[in-house]
C-alpha cells in the first residue's frame, strides 16, 4: 500500500487495520510530519514513512523505498485521499498518469474530490479561508475531474458523496447537508487499472 499526504499515523491508520504483514509506505510533503510519523511508527519493518509531494509521486516511486518494500510487485493499493483539491488540474493529471504508468495490472487507487460550491460567494469564502491558512484550493467540476484521472477507470459504485459511500447514518448525512449546505460535496471512489 502506498499512501500520499498521509498526515500522522495515529489511530487506525492503514498499517493498523490492514492484514498482518501488509507492507505500507506513507508519505507527506511536510518534513516535521514525516519526522514525527517516523517516531510513531518506530521499528516496524513493514511500514515506512518518507517525504514526498503528492503532485510528484515519482518522488516515492523512484526513491528505492518501493523496491525495498515491494520488490518487483507493482500490484498495489494507492491512497490519494483529501489531496486533489489542493493541486492544480495539471498536477492531478500528472500524478494520476505517473501512478497509472507505474502500477501493475489490477492495482486500485482511492481518491476523493470536492465539487464546486453552489454559489460564487460560497466558493470565494471557502477559497479565501484556505488562502489565509497558506493552502490554496483549486475547484474542479466533477466532469473535469473525471477527465484528469484518466486513464484510470472509475470502479463501481462510482464517485459518490462520501457520506453515502461510507454509508453514514441519515442523521449524519442531514447534519453534513445542513452545516455545509452550498459549499460543495466531497466525493470518493476507487479507480482501477
Residue ranges of predicted features:
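Short alpha-helix
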Residues: 136-159
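Core SAM-dependent methyltransferase catalytic element
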Residues: 165-193
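Short SAM/SAH-binding signature in class I
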Residues: 70-84
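Short, glycine-/aromatic-enriched active-site segment of Class I SAM-dependent methyltransferases
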Residues: 119-133
Amino acid at each position: 500500500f502506498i499512501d500520499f499526504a498521509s498526515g500522522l499515523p495515529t489511530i487506525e491508520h492503514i498499517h493498523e487495520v490492514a492484514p498482518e504483514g501488509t507492507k505500507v509506505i506513507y508519505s507527506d510533503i511536510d518534513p516535521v510530519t514525516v519526522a514525527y510519523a517516523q517516531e510513531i511508527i518506530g521499528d516496524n519493518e513493514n511500514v515506512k514513512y518518507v517525504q514526498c509531494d503528492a503532485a510528484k509521486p515519482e518522488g516515492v516511486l523512484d526513491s528505492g523505498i518501493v523496491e525495498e518494500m515491494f520488490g518487483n510487485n507493482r500490484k498495489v493499493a494507492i491512497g490519494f485521499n483529501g489531496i486533489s483539491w489542493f493541486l492544480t488540474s495539471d498536477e492531478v493529471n500528472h500524478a494520476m498518469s505517473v501512478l497509472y504508468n507505474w502500477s501493475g495490472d489490477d492495482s486500485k487507487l482511492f481518491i476523493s474530490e470536492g465539487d464546486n460550491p453552489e454559489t460564487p460567494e460560497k466558493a470565494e469564502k471557502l477559497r479565501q479561508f484556505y488562502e489565509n491558512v497558506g493552502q490554496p484550493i483549486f475547484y474542479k467540476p466533477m466532469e473535469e475531474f473525471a477527465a484528469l484521472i484518466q486513464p484510470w477507470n472509475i470502479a463501481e459504485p462510482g464517485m459518490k458523496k462520501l457520506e453515502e459511500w461510507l454509508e453514514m447514518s441519515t442523521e449524519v448525512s442531514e447534519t453534513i447537508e445542513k452545516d455545509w449546505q452550498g459549499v460543495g460535496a466531497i466525493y470518493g471512489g476507487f479507480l482501477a487499472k
